Amino acid sequence: MAKRLFMFEKPLGMRDTLPFLYEMKKQVRRTMAEEIERWGYEFIETPTLEYYETVGTASAIADHRLFKLLDQQGHTLVLRPDMTAPIARVAASRLYEDSNPLRLAYNANVFRAQQREGGRPAEFEQIGVELIGDGTVMADAEVISLMAALLKRVGLSHFSVAVGHIGYVNALFLEILGNEERASVLRRFLYEKNYVGYREHVKSLPLSSIDQKRLLDLLSLRGGSEAIEAAKALVTSEEGQRAADELAALLAALKTYGVSEAVKLDMALVSHMSYYTGILFEVYAEQVGFPIGNGGRYDDLLAKFSRPAPATGFGLRVDRLIEAIGETDVRGEIECIVFSQERLAEAVELAEAKRAEGQRVVLQHITGIRDIDAYSQRYRSIVYLLGRSGHDGQ
């Protein structure tokens, strides 16, 4: 009975991809890969399984979100929870040279366990890039501009990119709060976009009215270059001023790339990915309640693999991207040749000729069809090769 109960069920958070959605994913994948390669990035693949002690702990994904298992030697493994940490491992061990910035790309599924069924997948596909070895703001501008180019190539014309700097947030919190423990509480409110909770917590802190106002003013630091001047007035530390200057340089570069119209500053932007060290960003689209992609600078991650190097990159969620584009049946037009046994050779010859021309063709024996009317609805056209030659129907 228990076996029958789960006959059609899937593990928590897992999804099937039906033909029409698979075809749409394939087209999005192909289009984006072509654009990424035009920018000089090279694709890489990494194992689905990684060691927990290395990639698992470096990934910045909460431990309870990891799928863990043991190999036959007793080592703890994880299904990769993201692609940045595995690529950092490969780059640090086999590819990266100090004098040579590295441009890598990926298209892979990642895995994050769900505690309950809330509509979020435990396995999802990401497409993204990593630019390793370039610590300049120009590298951040490049990956953001590439991300915008990819979205436009797949037909997403309306999107917005929120850009912030984790160094700025950390500098402001350290100035006012004095320790990491108190700062982490406020960062969590910001990550969860719980601005009501943030305001209430700030008002409960034993701070002067001036410092409370500084923390509350952080939420209003949004928009264009004018927000940078307001941000600089809010902090006094060198780290905070430098972070604001980096954002100013980023906006100038993005204007040159022609994507500044889609970019808006959000100085309160915080990520759950703890390895981000500088500029970070999220991209949003209409009709989608979550970011369809995110990225940022992670200058300390490769040091965990004993090869310090600056790096930046992004990942786009394919499922959310397709939701933003709008699901449409993009299966190519398929033709079907229905044949009887005596016309088999003729049917095979016709199918091979059409396939050689790039057409998609199905060969189907007439006796294998239960309902010819229902079956024919699946195809653009039907060619019938039935009976003796000379008695075709279409």
Swiss-Prot record:
It is found in: Cytoplasm. The keyword Zinc does not apply. SUPFAM superfamilies: Class II aaRS and biotin synthetases (SSF55681). GO terms for cellular component: cytoplasm. Keywords: Amino-acid biosynthesis, Cytoplasm, Histidine biosynthesis. Its main location: cytoplasm. InterPro entries: aa-tRNA-synth_II (IPR006195), aa-tRNA-synth_II/BPL/LPL (IPR045864), HisRS-like_core (IPR041715), HisRS/HisZ (IPR004516), HisZ (IPR004517), HisZ-C (IPR053846). GO terms for molecular function: catalytic activity, acting on a protein; histidine-tRNA ligase activity; transferase activity. It holds the Pfam family tRNA-synt_His. GO terms for biological process: histidyl-tRNA aminoacylation; L-histidine biosynthetic process. NCBIfam families: hisZ_biosyn_reg (TIGR00443), PRK12292.2-4 (NF008941). HAMAP family: HisZ. Required for the first step of histidine biosynthesis. May allow the feedback regulation of ATP phosphoribosyltransferase activity by histidine. Belongs to the class-II aminoacyl-tRNA synthetase family. HisZ subfamily. Heteromultimer composed of HisG and HisZ subunits. This function is generally fulfilled by the C-terminal part of HisG, which is missing in some bacteria such as this one. This is ATP phosphoribosyltransferase regulatory subunit.
